């Protein structure tokens, strides 16, 4: 949405307050008094992560946690991409969904449904994280640091897109925070939580208990990105700090995937459904988990792949140019 902000790293290797959850601020009191609901540390921990991957508690296009958009449209990656790419000359989409053409021609305003959905996705995720931190902060220091990192990312995305933002670290009503104040808080929060994160180490889907969990490299990556655009956010450049934290990631055990497999290049392997079990896994610093079975979305990497292909393109590629296929049977043709 802003052409004067540098793009540094993709937050997923495929490659997140006016609380707006559908039933309020994550009320733990059941709507039906005949039902009881138990909020557990592991359940809420997973929900905080899942806000970046799924629309709600269902799959694909099922009902979502925010109002105004269907499940397939409301996901984090889809609206992050739409708002940052369709508003530039890097991408164009001919779909008639309300909001797409306004993005493409930069005619959006405060009533734009997808911008409102993106805003709500971030603030809803922040409310989940606030509840975890305020309820279960003493349960496990590493888990709490991870959720603080997820919340910091969502505040970063909010600040990056909207400038001045609503801010709260509890479930109380938010106060207004300027972009400079948000920058300062995010920086301090990241530096404070980093020591409690696990050491930087690539993970594969053979270890599902730790796969896609954030570690110190993810924190360094977000710090580097924050510092990279510091001049835009605060008026003061921080190039040396941006380089310092980028180098921490580069010097860690995470590495670029340089080895292809069969007819697929090393780069193509990053976007495949098995990228957690091949050499592509070593590149995934901040993964957003989707297994295509129990954790699915029409707004994640499937959107990035399927929206760029139509049926004719897929048919042509499968014969003459097999390495150009999009790796999925979905062809949405945007």
Segments from the language model and where they lie:
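Bacterial N-terminal signal peptides that target proteins for export
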Residues: 2-9
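Membrane-proximal, proline-rich intrinsically disordered regions
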Residues: 22-76
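Conserved, well-structured interaction surfaces
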Residues: 42, 46-50, 55-56, 90-162, ...
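Elongated scaffold/linker segments in the mid-to-C-terminal portions of large proteins
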Residues: 45, 49-59, 63, 73, ...
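Short coil/turn linking the two alpha-helices of tandem helical-hairpin repeats
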Residues: 159-166, 229-235
């Amino acid at each position: 949405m802003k052409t004067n902000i540098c793009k540094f790293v993709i937050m997923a290797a495929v490659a997140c307050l006016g609380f707006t959850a559908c039933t309020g601020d994550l009320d733990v009191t059941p709507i039906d008094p005949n039902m009881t609901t138990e909020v557990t540390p592991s359940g809420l921990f997973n929900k905080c992560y899942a806000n970046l991957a799924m629309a709600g508690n269902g799959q694909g296009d099922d009902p979502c946690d925010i109002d105004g958009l269907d499940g397939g449209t409301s996901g984090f990656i889809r609206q992050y991409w739409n708002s940052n790419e369709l508003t530039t000359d890097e991408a164009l989409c001919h779909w008639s969904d309300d909001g797409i053409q306004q993005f493409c021609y930069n005619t959006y305003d405060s009533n734009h449904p997808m911008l409102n959905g993106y805003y709500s996705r971030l603030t809803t995720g922040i409310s989940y994280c606030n509840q975890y931190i305020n309820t279960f902060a003493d349960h496990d220091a590493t888990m709490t640091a991870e959720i603080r990192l997820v919340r910091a990312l969502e505040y970063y995305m909010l600040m990056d897109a909207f400038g001045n933002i609503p801010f709260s670290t509890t479930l109380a009503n938010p106060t207004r925070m300027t972009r400079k104040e948000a920058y300062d808080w995010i920086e301090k929060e990241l530096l404070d939580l980093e020591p409690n994160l696990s050491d930087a180490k690539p993970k594969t889907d053979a270890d599902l208990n730790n796969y896609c969990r954030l570690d110190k490299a993810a924190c360094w990556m977000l710090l580097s990105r924050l510092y990279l655009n510091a001049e835009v956010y605060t008026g003061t450049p921080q190039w040396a700090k941006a380089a310092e934290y980028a180098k921490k990631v580069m010097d860690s055990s995470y590495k670029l995937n340089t080895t292809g497999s069969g007819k697929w290049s090393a780069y193509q392997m990053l976007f495949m459904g098995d990228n957690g079990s091949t050499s592509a896994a070593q590149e995934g610093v901040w993964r957003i988990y989707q297994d295509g079975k129990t954790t699915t979305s029409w707004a994640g990497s499937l959107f990035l792949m399927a929206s760029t292909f139509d049926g004719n393109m897929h048919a042509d590629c499968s014969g003459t140019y097999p390495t150009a296929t999009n790796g999925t049977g979905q062809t949405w043709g945007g």
